[in-house]
């Protein structure tokens, strides 16, 4: 599919696609949607009055009629005739008395209940709505409920398999959990044995999902087979640490005997942070309490590799900021291919300041407080380097397994210790290792080649990205080592890396290892994504994922190592968003179709020139059935042009969309550098719920700074986060406000994390001109409060760029008085975007006497907001708050009518006797 282009007479070219069993799509959010109960039921109707608004004309949009108000100044019972005398008069008199009493009682009830601004929850509003007539869309069925979204009922099923190399380097082996007719709990199959319906032909690694160790029942939560498939490393009692890291108790299962023993027999209950198999299957390197240990399976003895790990020194595992911003994982330990060496990080946090996180209800340490301290919160001190503050000092160390010796290799790189960020380590052959590192501001990349045998190293490649295009180096761990093979035309070792090339990210092949210039494998006005995916060394083929057909799509391609014969292996004639994982030799792959239609998975054979399907392993029939039963939004993908930049947009229209109506519009955004929210994945998420059940239009635009639209559009935001991104949101909102079917007086914007920052920044810049409402969850409000590695990558240091930090901070409180109202929510135990951001903003609002906002805090919740039903509550609050915004509740609060005294109102309620 060709990329949309601009048109002389239109600012965008739409491509309309209603939801059906053959097509659906997805956006992703920094916050995510997960299993939590919510309030809404399936039978609720879309929240939309018959005329497409709230049921009020323009004059009454923000003012409901108070109960009884129309009759308040009229006599309850009046007559122009005089009362008769005698018995008739007495009867009339008592009748009047009764009527007066009844009128007074009714007036009193109306006084107690009438005229108040009723805060209306989304569920209450939905119950009160009449279903709108079907028009504009052929979709039929029930609306999507928030409960369905939060509990994952709309989430596709994906088959979990792991490719492994066989003991004799066989290709096409995979590890998966058994089920159905397949024998065993954990098993290894090759592609051919999977075709046997009786399950025979594979190898069972674990017969049961539980194991017994010295009479103790162990229920493993995860398993890692050894390379020779004779043993399995198990983890139990797993506890989360940060986003990626966790600890647990580790066990080693012998496949033949189905017996297990502790990883460290001398300390069976010790909590381990990381454990990795040796490539020879004869040892496990592991980390406990920030020190590295080696267990050789030939004995029960554990070798201590490092001894001084602790609160300020981390060995083999990342600290908070490296886990979050550099590695995006829990391991900084790497075995050499020949199992002779282990490389690992030594992280010194002595100079990094602590940030306290209070826990008022829970105790993450698991420790019982001392007597008398039960009512004090637990305080967790986190080593958290903020922008401009001291960074952790990270060194790469090596362990010689045979000599039982730890050493380091000094390389002159012109980076000071606190000005170096190591972003990737890749073992080559014969004890050589490639190390990619950047300066603190992530705009100079240096590649080192270290020889562990001679214990020497040197810089072999330098890229000054700041001078190239003013951009930055995004950390990644996708560099691929290519061993020499003269018989296949590769006389020297080499590697494949992603490099900037003519304004886009592309693949280059560097050979030999110390080559400063690579052979370009890809080129063009499009970008590769997390590439390469795999390399077929026998055929000299490089497989990769790219956004070539459109920024919103992902297809799989392959190219020769000399850059020739690039071809797609997925169908590029229609929109698609594919993912892939390859077998050890790249002869097979698990192909995952993520959308826009219902996702499916298949194992494919890539040995020949033609790709063949071996087995379709997942088709998600339950989603196909649900799509037929529910009224889903129509999604329209299009482009807008802002300041000459083409931006991707998706508009979600409610079922039965009627262009003659006026609809409220919610903008949803994330907008962080290199991110993407507008894509062709299948998803029924919170935005889908808003369109389907509440009847609002939802628009998402990926503005400047986001990913896969070229480096020029991406790098322009550097040093001034929020400046261009907010303008793109406002410019797009103005385009929508001018549409005939949009109610320009009811437009809102919301986002989480960076999206929360963008919500506030957009409201600040817009000053109520376009957006009347906003909802910000866990927002950054000052980039000096965020971590150093992320902030400085996109903003430089505060010392280097003080004006940029000042401009990016939410400071214009006067501008924030112009929207009708905005909402800010935050978890009090957010270790990522600290509560400090919202508290400092609140203080600024107080000092400026700003009142048009609401706050909601979630005790003990971190950045994902999950603690004690918080995840359900945060989305319920978003939904309810939005309903009240578009129903005019917040406008009534902002423009209150002066109230009457109780006595005046009581007198008005009395009947007038004539």
Curated annotation (Swiss-Prot):
Lineage of the organism: Eukaryota, Fungi, Dikarya, Ascomycota, Pezizomycotina
Bias-annotated ranges (Basic and acidic residues): 1-10
Provenance organism: Aspergillus clavatus (strain ATCC 1007 / CBS 513.65 / DSM 816 / NCTC 3887 / NRRL 1 / QM 1276 / 107)
Name of this protein: Probable dipeptidyl-aminopeptidase B
Example GO BP: proteolysis
Cellular compartments per GO CC: fungal-type vacuole membrane; plasma membrane
Carbohydrate attachment residues: 348, 565, 639, 807
Location of the protein in the cell: Vacuole membrane
Vacuolar side: 113-914
